[in-house]
């Protein structure tokens, strides 16, 4: 699989789901009242409990309370400090509580878990499934680490667990992988899965501002946490990639087994050099299944400026899939936010309710999940950016090391106008495996003229 340069992937309009939130903004903010109107068509009268009343939980409750006809009946809302959370628009017969066990002991049929994290979310979800209650969750950490086990537990108890909101927020990529594309044999998935990183990188690209300034702007706009390490260093994206691998490639992957590279070293000058190569820079999460090996990686990459990935701006998400029969598909939209994520949660809720009431199908059986070997040893062209103290013989020394490691130089780029005490220049390499490149990088890191670690980025064509 080649992302994003294949012909089908370039024709992004041919096979694409565009989420509502990715369309041009309207003059007035969309209301949660515009959520799926066919809630009223579900006649299951399912009793639903909501655990977690933060941004997403509140939006979910608002959709259920303002658009429902009682067929999906919210009966419990559970949260810490619950008295401070109460809202006048919630019906008077809804039970507000901070006692999770009382919710699990009640007669609810579906539990919505929106507290996030592993503890106590894992125990809550296992308890609910163990008692035969279906679960809807947006918890990426939980599904990334325990998804296969939870799917098996649900199957053994005759209930369901749905997690469509755990990746890409309001973009229905996970339901599509588990239902709409289940007839295909997918072999590759790649995506822009973290809106924080995409916002920062696209701001550096468009304004040529320092990384630190772009991060501060993202934090001021609410796109990045005060401690954004999980986003910047790839932890968030690799958890999401593990979920996509489970849903689309039927592969059990521990998130920590996926190599994650930080976007922190990316400099504005890298966008200048990337532009000379017809590229820009994005954080790309990619997984490619070949026989019994899953090649997986998360980190900044050079992508063609006119490719689907290169055109994604701000905090949007894009997922591309490649299948043996159906070819390439693209899913684009808002990857975070209360309303888009709530729509995904409610859509999962409706699917479960319809299954309970009408004997509908279940998604995502875990019986065919395999545990492949995980590798980051992709073969690809490479972009190497150095910062050096200028002196004679630098290129010759670097070329000598690369030749010793059987690496072929493709091009050398050097822009004028920089101080000789801190001179950036770029070497691009012909395709080679990661395992050949890194011993050479370790050797070059010890050269006396280097003043920053070499930035090494894959070039995706």
Please give the residue ranges for each predicted region.
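Catalytic, metal-anchored helix/loop core of enzyme active sites in primary metabolism
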Residues: 95, 186-190, 196-201, 205, ...
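N-terminal Rossmann-fold NAD(P) dinucleotide-binding loop
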Residues: 57
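Rossmann-fold NAD(P)-binding glycine/threonine-rich loop
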Residues: 122-127, 140-167, 174-177
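Substrate-binding/catalytic subdomain of NAD(P)-dependent oxidoreductase enzymes
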Residues: 213-311, 316-318
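Rossmann-fold NAD(P) dinucleotide-binding segment
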Residues: 100-138
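A short, basic/flexible loop-to-alpha-helix module at the beginning of a structural domain
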Residues: 16-20, 24-25, 29-45
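A conserved regulatory-domain signal marking ACT and ACT-like small-molecule sensing domains
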Residues: 3, 13, 29, 51, ...
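NAD(P)-binding Rossmann-fold cofactor-contacting core
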Residues: 67-89
């Amino acid at each position: 699989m080649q992302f994003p340069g294949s012909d089908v992937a370039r024709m992004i309009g041919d096979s694409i789901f565009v989420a509502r939130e990715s369309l041009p903004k309207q003059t007035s903010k969309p209301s949660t009242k515009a959520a799926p109107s066919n809630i009223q068509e579900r006649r299951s009268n399912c009793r639903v409990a909501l655990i977690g009343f933060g941004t997403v939980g509140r939006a979910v409750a608002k959709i259920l309370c303002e658009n429902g006809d009682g067929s999906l009946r919210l009966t419990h809302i559970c949260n810490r400090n619950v008295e401070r959370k109460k809202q006048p628009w919630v019906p008077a017969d809804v039970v507000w509580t901070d006692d999770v066990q009382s919710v699990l002991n009640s007669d609810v049929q579906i539990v919505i878990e929106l507290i996030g994290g592993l503890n106590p979310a894992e125990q809550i979800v296992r308890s609910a499934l163990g008692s035969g209650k279906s679960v809807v969750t947006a918890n990426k950490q939980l599904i990334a680490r325990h998804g296969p086990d939870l799917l098996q537990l649900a199957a053994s108890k005759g209930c369901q667990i749905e997690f469509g909101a755990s990746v890409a927020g309001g973009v229905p990529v996970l339901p599509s992988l588990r239902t709409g594309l289940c007839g295909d044999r997918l072999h590759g998935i790649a995506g822009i899965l973290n809106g924080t990183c995409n916002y920062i990188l696209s701001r550096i690209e468009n304004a040529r501002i320092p990384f630190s300034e772009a991060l501060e702007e993202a934090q001021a706009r609410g796109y990045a946490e005060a401690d954004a390490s999980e986003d910047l260093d790839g932890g968030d994206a690799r958890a999401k990639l593990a979920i996509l691998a489970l849903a689309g490639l039927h592969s059990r992957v521990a998130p920590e087994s996926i190599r994650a590279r930080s976007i922190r070293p990316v400099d504005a000058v890298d966008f200048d050099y990337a532009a000379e190569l017809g590229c820009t820079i994005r954080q790309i999460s990619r997984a490619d299944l070949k026989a019994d090996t899953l090649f997986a990686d998360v980190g900044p990459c050079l992508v063609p400026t006119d490719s689907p990935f290169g055109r994604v701006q701000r905090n949007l998400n894009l997922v591309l899939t490649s299948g043996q029969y159906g070819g390439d598909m693209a899913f684009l939209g808002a990857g975070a936010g209360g309303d888009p994520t709530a729509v995904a949660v409610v859509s999962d809720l409706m699917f479960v309710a319809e299954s309970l009431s009408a004997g509908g199908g279940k998604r995502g059986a875990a019986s065919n999940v395999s545990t492949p070997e995980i590798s980051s040893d992709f073969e690809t062209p490479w972009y190497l950016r150095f910062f050096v103290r200028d002196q004679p013989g630098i290129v010759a020394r670097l070329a000598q090391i690369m030749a010793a490691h059987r690496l072929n130089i493709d091009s050398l780029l050097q822009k004028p106008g920089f101080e000789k005490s801190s001179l950036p220049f770029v070497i691009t390499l012909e395709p080679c495996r990661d395992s050949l490149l890194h011993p050479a990088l370790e050797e070059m890191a010890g050269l006396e003229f280097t003043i920053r670690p070499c930035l090494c980025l894959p070039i995706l064509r």
